[in-house]
Amino acid sequence: MSSDCQGKQSWPELVGVRGEVAEATIERENPAVNAVIVPERSIGDTQFRCDRVRVRVDDNGIVSSVPRVG
């Protein structure tokens, strides 16, 4: 399914950086997506979307897992 999406699909290099930095980087590198910062323990919907990247952050606002399109 993700192969149908345009542009960069994942950002492993952003694990460990501040969520706001990751959000801006993702949107700059793939203008087709909207990056959304969410707490790492939050439960989101399971619908796959090519225009969304969830940026999961820990309690300190640091990216805790690889942001991916979906």
What are these regions (language model features)?
Residues 1-70:
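Exposed, flexible binding/inhibitory loops of compact, secreted disulfide-stabilized domains
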